[in-house]
Every structure is written in structure tokens, then in C-alpha cells.
């Protein structure tokens, strides 16, 4: 396959390019009978929308979603759901000099070597613009999981460049443009303003969480839940690392600490991040992703053109000084898509499993 479809039973096919007429996706496998409207999807799209603050790209796309199929009388029918988002604010002239040059850190060179042709306008198919359909599909998955299991998804930024962001409360995340769990974001605004003025960019660390998780999701050996989570999140533009639970901090832990001990009252900790043996435990899914600095910067960089000549590249156009800012709702969506797919797979195989012991409560947050 050509890598444009994600999922097994809840399958999402993504289509479009950054500067094409439209982008979108087709969802196949959504259970019938779920109430669904464009408003259910638009809320999450508005959270990742470009032009939403002065700290992100000023490409001003409304990202208004259109449901083309799969809905009748306000409910899913069980047939493919086609979602369309029209591109309305392309500025292709900004990329007129990019057709024969390779921007360092971008997919220009690798796409050209693979296909022998590439769309230089805004990165074409490799653009983060293509995460909008992912967020739209994730909103559908989120709604079904919330109705079926009470599962909720949330994410926040925990580091901006070299600045760690302390966790204060989840309520702060929706009240600032950084999706930061703090009340005061003045220092982060100053940091981004200085980066933009210097023609530079930075990376970010994003924490992602799913609460109200059902037990038993995951298909060993090769479709483990945590393996599929890592696979999905590594598919997000600019992600260079995924941690689940304690992640790399596990190296310095002792077994007496890392093992999530259990009592009749519940788990005492969640260093595993809600997954054991590739199967969900019912504890919260806890993970973090590392996002590299934005490759599109005003500062000149050495590169070559398609003829092999040395050139200097300075990227024009409208770009995010930190793509991690808008990655938060995208990471939520990808996690929701993985959980949704595994929930349907688990229900198909193990719906009749009955045990005498109820699920063990999760450790206190």
C-alpha cells in the first residue's frame, strides 16, 4: 500500500495537498447509529486552525468541514464517512523559487528522490496542512469512545524550546495559545517573539493522555497498543521521539519502583503508561512526544538545487516558529484513532469474555 490509509477496522484514508483545491479523508468502519454533525468535528479543527494566534502561521484558513456521506438524519449509517476541508488561503507564489531547490530539514529532497516529481507549493503532500483531516477523523473517534466507554483525550505543551513548562492544571490549557497547563504564558510569548525576530524556530514537548480507558485493548505480538501508538505519533509531522509512561526515565529506575504494584484498592502507580504486554490495563494512557524545530526559517541555510549546485536557501512564506504549538490537538486525534481501532478489534474478538474480578482501579492522578 502507498501509506495513505491508517487503521484496520476503523480505517482513515487521507487525501489532498497543501495548495490543492481541498484536503480531506474517508472514514471506513464507523459503527452505525451515532449522532454526528459537522459541529462535533469543527470544535477540534478550530483548535488546530492556522491563523488562530500571532504565534503560529498566519495562513488564515477557516478549515470548515463538510460531511459528504455516511450520515442520514443526523446519525452515522455504518457506510464510509467522507469529510472535505477546502483550501481557501493558498499563496503559491511564495514557493516560486522552491521548485528547483531543496529546503534543509524538509521532505523536498526525499520526496523528489522517491517519486521523481514533487509539489513544491507549501510542501505539497508532506505539509502539516494534511493533519487537518486527521483531526477531523479523530473527532469522530473521540465522540464514539466517549459515548461507549467515557474515554476522554487531552494534551498539553510541557516544554517550549529550552523552556520547561510546569504543570499547574488542565483547565489552563484551553485558555492560552500555547496549550500550556499554566496561567501565565508571558515568558513563552516573549520567547516566540524573539525567535521570530531572529528568523529562527524551536521544538517542543507535548504530553498526551487518555482517561477512562477500557481494559484489554491491544493485539500481541505485532499490533500491541503501545506499538501502534508510537507508530501513529511518529507519523505526525516533525515528531522525532515518543515516550510511553516513564519512557527513557525507566533506564534510571529500579524494578522496585517501576513495577506498578497492585492492591485490592487499585494500582499504586502508572509508570507503564497504561499498557502492559501491549494491552491496556484500564489506567490512563500517558505519553509524550518530542517535536523538532520548524524547518522553514528566514535565516539563510546552505543547500543544493536539483542540478547539484550549491545554493543558499531562505524560506519565505507564512510558517509556524514552533509547530509544536498546534500539534496538541493533532496528537490527541492520533491517539483517539489508535484507541478507536483497537476498541473495535477487541469487541470483535473478545466481546464475550467474562471474568469474576472487576477491573482494578487506576492509580490516583
From Swiss-Prot:
It catalyses: 5-O-(1-carboxyvinyl)-3-phosphoshikimate = chorismate + phosphate. Its EC number is 4.2.3.5. Its cofactor is FMNH2. GO terms for biological process: amino acid biosynthetic process; aromatic amino acid family biosynthetic process; chorismate biosynthetic process. NADP(+) binds at residues 48, 54. GO terms for molecular function: chorismate synthase activity; FMN binding. Reduced FMN (FMNH(2)). Disulfide bonds: none annotated. FMN binds at residues 125-127, 237-238, 277, 292-296, 318. Belongs to the chorismate synthase family. This reaction introduces a second double bond into the aromatic ring system. This is Chorismate synthase. It comes from Verminephrobacter eiseniae (strain EF01-2). The gene is aroC.
